[in-house]
């Protein structure tokens, strides 16, 4: 298992945890002095009280929690949010409220999932043409919505 260094910037911060044995993402919790209300149609930056040191060649992705999305229409507008290996500041989560009701975030609430993944930097090679494929330039729904 990959070891990632983590610092509690606030002693009240909760470490990310896997909710189940085979979970891909760890639950990330809010670290707040007072509740934050995310008004309908708005976004708020939520502190976690944590900083991480990822190994070179890795990123951490912050993703919405499915239960918050389904029940409250709460999501992350930049999902997946990327935390680069060279970032050393506090991990914060942008929550957006797509619902009609205000959403209150309290200290300790699980607000996002974190997935740590290997990444590779690439270099582009400029060419005059690209190879042909069956799909070609088809995109954005070109295969339709019909049954499988």
UniProtKB/Swiss-Prot annotation:
Reactions that this protein is recorded to catalyse: dUTP + H2O = dUMP + diphosphate + H(+)
EC category name: hydrolase
GO MF entries: dUTP diphosphatase activity; magnesium ion binding
Keyword check for Chaperone: no
Enzyme Commission code(s) on record: 3.6.1.23
Binding site for substrate: 65-67, 78, 82-84, 92
Names of the cofactor(s): Mg(2+)
Pathway the protein contributes to: Pyrimidine metabolism; dUMP biosynthesis; dUMP from dCTP (dUTP route): step 2/2
InterPro entries tied to this protein: dUTPase, dUTPase-like, dUTPase-like_sf, dUTPase_trimeric
Classification via Pfam families: dUTPase (PF00692)
UniProt keyword annotations, A-Z: Hydrolase, Magnesium, Metal-binding, Nucleotide metabolism
Keyword Nucleotide-binding: no
Family matches, as Gene3D superfamilies: 2.70.40.10
GO process terms (BP): dUMP biosynthetic process; dUTP catabolic process
Family recorded in the similarity comment: Belongs to the dUTPase family.
PANTHER family (alphabetical): DEOXYURIDINE 5'-TRIPHOSPHATE NUCLEOTIDOHYDROLASE
HAMAP family: dUTPase_bact
Entry function: This enzyme is involved in nucleotide metabolism: it produces dUMP, the immediate precursor of thymidine nucleotides and it decreases the intracellular concentration of dUTP so that uracil cannot be incorporated into DNA.
Name of the protein this chain belongs to: Deoxyuridine 5'-triphosphate nucleotidohydrolase
Organism per entry: Chlorobium luteolum (strain DSM 273 / BCRC 81028 / 2530)
Taxon lineage: Bacteria, Pseudomonadati, Chlorobiota, Chlorobiia, Chlorobiales
């Amino acid at each position: 298992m990959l070891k990632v260094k983590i610092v509690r910037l606030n002693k009240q911060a909760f470490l990310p945890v896997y909710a189940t044995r085979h979970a891909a993402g760890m639950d990330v919790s809010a670290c707040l002095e007072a509740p934050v209300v995310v008004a309908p149609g708005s976004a708020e930056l939520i502190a976690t009280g944590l900083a991480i040191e990822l190994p070179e060649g890795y990123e951490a992705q912050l993703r919405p929690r499915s239960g918050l999305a389904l029940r409250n229409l709460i999501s992350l507008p930049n999902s997946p949010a990327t935390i680069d290996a060279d970032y050393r500041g506090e991990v914060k989560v942008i929550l957006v409220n797509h619902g009609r009701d205000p959403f209150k975030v309290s200290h300790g609430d699980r607000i996002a999932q974190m997935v740590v993944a290997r990444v590779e930097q690439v270099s582009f090679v400029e060419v005059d043409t690209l190879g042909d494929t069956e799909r070609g330039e088809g995109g954005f729904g070109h295969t339709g919505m019909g049954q499988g």
